[in-house]
């Protein structure tokens, strides 16, 4: 990892937790040592964004797990970036594979959400990644480049974007991409940014890895030159998240 890229660890709590056990988790995180050279962001369920922001130490930022592409309107069940900011959160996760595959979100919709969230001043954790059949068919590159292009077409300022590579076959399955597999894709993604956006953006943009990251797997993954952090699912609800935050130490 280039020294200019601050290590980034996101915890995606997904649809988990209640105030009591999330409060306990927050207590653990508040007591934890967060290295000065590491940025930490937690993404609670929407109903708990306010709760998490009030309870979490200011050293840990808060993200929403999703948002819509417009400011207000007749969109029952949706939330806007403006609402997310009003609750004190500063980031949003967009394009997560569960949004793509469980809820049928298209590349186009995700691109529109990215553009609107950035325009409203949120940081965006933009997720991309291939399914198992796509990896086995040898089209990983094609899939992740196409997804990245739609995101890139909607970004004016890359300083507020973190790219999260999440091989779908490794999410919640216990299968982790090997450090070498992760590095290979991250390196290719950085190459794509260099060729299609700019050398400066390629060097400064953080590309993080997601997919069954645990306290046991994080150190070797973090040692790869193009792995700039993690987006952590299940393990972010456990005390081992503190170990992952300290993966570079």
Curated annotation (Swiss-Prot):
EC code(s) of this entry: 5.3.1.1, 4.2.3.3
One Pfam family of this chain: TIM
GO cellular component entries: cytosol
Phosphothreonine carried by residues: 173, 214
SUPFAM superfamilies noted in UniProt: Triosephosphate isomerase (TIM)
Residues recorded as bearing 3'-nitrotyrosine in the entry: 68, 209
Keyword tags: Acetylation, Cytoplasm, Gluconeogenesis, Glycolysis, Isomerase, Isopeptide bond, Lyase, Methylation, Nitration, Phosphoprotein, Ubl conjugation
Lyase found in the keyword field: yes
Chain residue numbers at which the record places covalent cross-link Glycyl lysine isopeptide (Lys-Gly) (interchain with G-Cter in SUMO1): 142
GO molecular function terms attached to this record: methylglyoxal synthase activity; protein homodimerization activity; triose-phosphate isomerase activity
Residues found modified as N6-acetyllysine: 14, 156, 194, 238
Modified sites of kind N6-methyllysine: 194
Catalytic activity line of the entry: dihydroxyacetone phosphate = methylglyoxal + phosphate; D-glyceraldehyde 3-phosphate = dihydroxyacetone phosphate
Active site positions, chain numbering: 96 (electrophile), 166 (proton acceptor)
Gene3D superfamilies hit by this protein: Aldolase class I (3.20.20.70)
UniProt modified residues of type N6-succinyllysine: 149, 156, 194
Known partners and oligomeric status: Homodimer.
Matches recorded under NCBIfam families: tim
HAMAP family noted in UniProt: TIM_B
PANTHER family in alphabetical order: TRIOSEPHOSPHATE ISOMERASE
The protein, known as: Triosephosphate isomerase
Lineage: Eukaryota, Metazoa, Chordata, Craniata, Vertebrata
């Amino acid at each position: 990892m280039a020294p200019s890229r601050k290590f980034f660890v996101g915890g995606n709590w997904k649809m988990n937790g209640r105030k009591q056990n999330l409060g306990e988790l927050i207590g653990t995180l508040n007591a934890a040592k967060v290295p000065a050279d590491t940025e930490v962001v937690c993404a609670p369920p929407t109903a708990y964004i306010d709760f998490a922001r009030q309870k979490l130490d200011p050293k840990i930022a808060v993200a929403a797990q999703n948002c819509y592409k417009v400011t207000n309107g007749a969109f029952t069940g949706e939330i806007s970036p403006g609402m997310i900011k009003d609750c004190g959160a500063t980031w949003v996760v967009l394009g997560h594979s569960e949004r793509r595959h469980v809820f049928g979100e298209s590349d186009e919709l995700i691109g529109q959400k990215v553009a609107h969230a950035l325009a409203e001043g949120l940081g965006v954790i933009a997720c991309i990644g291939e399914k198992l059949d796509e990896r086995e068919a040898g089209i990983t590159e094609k899939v992740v480049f196409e997804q990245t292009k739609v995101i890139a077409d909607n970004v004016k300022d890359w300083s507020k974007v973190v790219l999260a590579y999440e091989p779908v076959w490794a999410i919640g399955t216990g299968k982790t991409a090997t450090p070498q597999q992760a590095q290979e894709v991250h390196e290719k993604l950085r190459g794509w940014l260099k060729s299609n956006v700019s050398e400066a953006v390629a060097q400064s943009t953080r590309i993080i890895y997601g997919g069954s990251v645990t306290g046991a797997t994080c150190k070797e993954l973090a040692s790869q030159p193009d792995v700039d952090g993690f987006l952590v699912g299940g393990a972010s609800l456990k005390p081992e998240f503190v170990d992952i935050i300290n993966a570079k130490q």
